[in-house]
Swiss-Prot record:
Family per record: Belongs to the UvrC family.
Keyword annotations: Cytoplasm, DNA damage, DNA excision, DNA repair, Excision nuclease, SOS response
Keyword DNA repair listed: yes
Gene3D superfamilies for this protein: 5' to 3' exonuclease, C-terminal subdomain, GIY-YIG endonuclease, UVR domain, UvrC, RNAse H endonuclease domain
Biological role stated in the UniProt entry: The UvrABC repair system catalyzes the recognition and processing of DNA lesions. UvrC both incises the 5' and 3' sides of the lesion. The N-terminal half is responsible for the 3' incision and the C-terminal half is responsible for the 5' incision.
GO MF assignments: DNA binding; excinuclease ABC activity
UniProt-recorded name of the protein: UvrABC system protein C
Record-linked Pfam families: GIY-YIG (PF01541), UVR (PF02151), UvrC_RNaseH (PF22920), UvrC_RNaseH_dom (PF08459)
First-listed, main subcellular location of the protein, grouped into a coarse class: cytoplasm
Organism from which the protein derives: Caldicellulosiruptor saccharolyticus (strain ATCC 43494 / DSM 8903 / Tp8T 6331)
GIY-YIG domain mapped to chain residues: 13-91
Subunit structure and binding partners: Interacts with UvrB in an incision complex.
InterPro entries: GIY-YIG_endonuc, GIY-YIG_endonuc_sf, GIY-YIG_UvrC_Cho, RuvA_2-like, UVR_dom, UVR_dom_sf, UvrABC_protein_C, UvrC
Length: 593
C-alpha cells in the first residue's frame, strides 16, 4: 500500500476530483482541480492557509482522486460527490429531505404527489416548499381544480380493473382508472396544473371566467357557481406569487449578507414575471463560499432560468454557465447589473439576507447565553452543545413507548429524533421503560451521532436515577437532569443530583428548558396519535362480522381513517371498497352514521 507521500508523487497533471479521508477512511473534504498534482500538493506544502483548512489538513490520512477530461466535468463530479458524502469541511447546502416538492410524475396519466427527493426521472418538480402546510393546501386546491390522480395504480396494466378510490366519489379525481378517460383530455389538465405551478395561473383564470359567463348566460347558475369557486381557489395560489415584471421573463436573483461567522444567501426565484419562491441558505462563512454555493446550487436544481442575476462577477462564472449547458441542455447567462430593475431586485435580496442574518445571530446569541446559564446552574465543566431529551408514555397501560428529541448546536435536529416501542415487559412501569430506552440508545451508538453533553428526562428523581444507573453500567458519565412539571403539564423546575433546582420564570434557562420540554411532549403526543389511530381503526373494524383482514386493509387503503369512513355514505363505501350493502351498513352503524 502506497504512503501519502508516494501517492502525492504519483499524482497526474490532468483535471479531476480529489477526496480527502481521515484515519477512519471517512471522506472529510471533496475538491476539484484543473491540475490534480498542483492542487493536492498545495495542502501539504502551503503554510498560508486558513485555520479551518489547517485543521482539516491535520486530519488527512489518505486521499483518492478521479481523473476527468475537462474542468467542467470535474465541477459536476465534485458537486455529486459532495451531495453523496456530505463531507465535514465542504460548504453544504440544505439536506433536501427537509424540504418538500410538488411532483407531477412522468407516466401514463401522471400523478400529482409530494416528495422530498428530486430525481432525474423525467418528472416535473416544483419547489422547494419550506411549509408542509403550504404544500398540502396547494395539492388540495389543484386536485379540486384539475382532478389529477394521486393513487399508485400502474397503467396501462391496471387500467379498467377494480373500482375507483374515494377521491373519485368526492370529486377530487377524474377516475382515469375506470379506463374511459382519453389520455389527451387528461394531459390538457396536467398542462394547466403545470402552468399554475409555473406562475402562469392567470391564463387559466381567464379561461375559467369565460366558461363561467357562458354558463351564466345560459342560465346554468349552479355550473357557473362551481366555476366561480374554482376561480376563487386558483386565486389563492396566484395571490402568493408577487408580480415583478410586466412581461413573462424568468430569472434567479441571488445576493447575500455576511458577518465574520456566517453568510446568508437569498435566491429570489422569478418565473414568467412573478416571484414564485424565495430560498434562504445560512452557511459558515469561508473563503470562496459564494462561488462554492453557486456550483452546488446549479448542479441539481429543479428549474434553471436563462438569466442568473448576481451582485458581482465570480471567478467560476464561466464554468457555471458551461455546467448548466451540459446538465440542462441550454445556455444560461450570468448578469451583473449596475442599475435598473435588476439592481433593485438585488437590493431586495440583500435586504432579506441581512434580516435573516440578524435574526439568526439573535437566536444564536440567545441560545449561547441560555446554554451558558444552564451549564453554570448545573455546575457542569464542559460546554453544552448537544442535549438529548427523553419522554416515556403509554396508552392506558398498553403500548409503552419512548421518544427522543435532540437539541444540537442551537436548534432541534429532527434527523436524530427517535421512537422506541418498548418490548421487554408488559404493563406500565416508567423506571423499566427509562432503562430500556437508554440501554437501546447507548448500545447502538452509530445511529445517534455524537454523544450528548446533557440528558434531560421528562420526569422526577426516580426516572433520573434509572437513567444514571444505565449510563454508568455502560461506562458513560453523562449528566442527567429531570424536567419537573406543574399541574398544567408545564415546566416547573429541574432535578439534578438529588436536588430540585428552582428556575426563575423569566430566565433564559427556563425558556430554553420549556422549549425543549414542549418539543419533546409534541413529538411524544404525535407518536401516540399514530398508535391510537392504528388501534382505533383495528379494534372497531375487528368487531364487525364480515370484515376480515383483507377487507380491513382495503378500507384503510381507500379511506385512510375512521373519520373519512364516517363521512362517506353507505353507497360510497359499497362502490369504493366493493363490499356488500349489508356489511357497509354494519360499518356505518358501528362507527356512527
Amino acid at each position: 500500500m502506497l504512503t501519502l507521500q508516494e501517492k502525492l508523487a504519483n499524482l497526474p497533471t490532468t483535471p479531476g476530483v480529489y477526496m480527502m479521508k481521515d484515519e477512519n477512511g471517512k471522506v472529510i473534504y471533496v475538491g476539484k482541480a484543473v491540475n490534480l498534482r498542483n492542487r493536492v500538493r498545495q495542502y501539504f506544502q502551503n503554510s498560508d492557509m486558513t485555520p479551518k483548512t489547517r485543521l482539516m489538513v491535520k486530519k488527512i490520512k489518505d486521499f483518492e482522486y478521479i481523473v476527468t477530461d475537462t474542468e467542467v466535468e470535474a465541477l459536476i463530479l465534485e458537486c455529486n460527490l459532495i451531495k453523496e458524502y456530505r463531507p465535514k469541511y465542504n460548504v453544504l447546502l440544505r439536506d433536501d429531505k427537509n424540504y418538500q416538492y410538488i411532483k407531477i410524475t412522468n407516466e401514463m396519466f401522471p400523478r400529482l404527489v409530494t416528495t422530498r427527493k428530486v430525481e432525474k426521472d423525467g418528472a416535473k418538480y416544483f419547489g422547494p416548499y419550506v411549509s408542509g402546510y403550504s404544500v398540502k393546501q396547494t395539492i388540495e386546491l389543484l386536485k379540486s381544480l384539475f382532478m389529477l390522480r394521486t393513487c399508485k395504480r400502474k397503467f396501462p396494466d391496471q387500467l379498467g380493473k377494480g373500482r375507483p378510490c374515494l377521491n373519485f366519489y368526492i370529486e377530487r379525481c377524474l377516475g382515469v382508472c375506470k379506463g374511459d378517460i382519453p389520455e389527451e383530455e387528461y394531459q390538457k389538465l396536467v398542462e394547466k396544473a403545470v402552468k399554475v405551478l409555473s406562475g402562469k395561473g392567470d391564463e387559466i383564470v381567464e379561461e375559467l371566467k369565460k366558461k363561467m359567463f357562458e354558463y351564466a348566460d345560459n342560465l346554468m347558475f349552479e355550473k357557473a357557481q362551481e366555476i366561480k369557486n374554482k376561480i376563487t381557489s386558483l386565486e389563492q395560489i396566484i395571490t402568493k406569487q408577487k408580480v415583478i415584471y410586466a412581461d413573462d421573463r424568468s430569472e434567479d436573483v441571488i445576493n447575500y449578507a455576511e458577518d465574520s461567522s456566517n453568510i446568508c444567501i437569498v435566491v429570489l426565484v422569478i418565473r414568467n414575471g412573478k416571484l414564485i419562491n424565495k430560498e434562504e441558505f445560512v452557511l459558515k462563512n469561508d473563503e470562496e463560499v459564494f462561488e462554492r454555493f453557486l456550483e452546488q446550487y446549479y448542479s441539481d436544481v429543479v428549474s434553471v432560468p436563462k438569466e442568473i442575476i448576481l451582485p458581482h462577477e465570480v471567478g467560476n462564472g464561466e464554468n457555471i454557465e458551461k455546467m448548466i449547458e451540459k446538465l440542462y441542455g441550454f445556455k444560461a447567462k450570468i448578469v451583473v447589473p449596475k442599475q435598473g430593475e435588476k439592481k433593485q431586485l438585488l437590493e431586495m435580496a440583500k435586504k432579506n439576507a441581512e434580516i435573516s442574518l440578524v435574526n439568526k445571530q439573535r437566536i444564536e446569541n440567545y441560545y449561547i447565553e441560555a446554554l451558558l446559564h444552564l451549564k453554570n446552574l448545573l455546575g457542569i465543566e464542559h460546554d453544552i452543545e448537544k442535549i438529548e431529551s427523553y419522554d416515556i408514555s403509554n396508552l392506558a397501560g398498553a403500548d409503552n413507548v419512548g421518544t427522543l428529541v435532540v437539541f444540537e448546536d442551537g436548534k432541534f435536529n429532527k434527523d436524530l429524533y427517535r421512537k422506541f416501542k418498548l418490548k421487554s415487559f408488559e404493563g406500565q412501569d416508567d423506571i423499566r421503560s427509562v432503562k430500556e430506552v437508554l440501554t437501546r440508545r447507548f448500545t447502538n451508538l452509530e445511529k445517534h451521532g455524537r454523544l450528548p453533553d446533557l440528558i434531560l428526562i421528562d420526569g422526577g428523581q426516580n426516572q433520573v436515577n434509572a437513567a444514571v444507573e444505565v449510563l454508568r453500567s455502560l461506562g458513560f458519565n453523562i449528566p442527567v437532569a429531570g424536567m419537573v412539571k406543574d399541574d398544567r403539564h408545564k415546566t416547573r423546575d429541574l432535578i439534578y443530583k438529588g436536588q430540585e433546582l428552582n428556575i426563575q420564570r423569566d430566565s433564559l434557562v427556563f425558556k430554553l428548558i420549556s422549549t425543549i420540554q414542549e418539543e419533546t411532549h409534541r413529538f411524544a403526543v404525535k407518536y401516540h396519535r399514530e398508535l391510537r389511530k392504528k388501534h382505533l381503526y383495528e379494534s372497531i373494524l375487528d368487531e364487525i362480522e364480515g370484515i376480515g383482514e383483507k377487507r380491513k386493509i382495503k378500507l384503510f387503503r381507500i379511506f385512510g381513517s375512521i373519520d373519512n369512513l364516517r363521512k362517506a355514505s353507505i353507497e360510497e363505501i359499497v362502490k369504493a371498497a366493493d363490499i356488500p350493502y349489508d356489511i357497509a351498513l354494519k360499518i356505518k352503524e358501528k362507527i356512527g352514521i
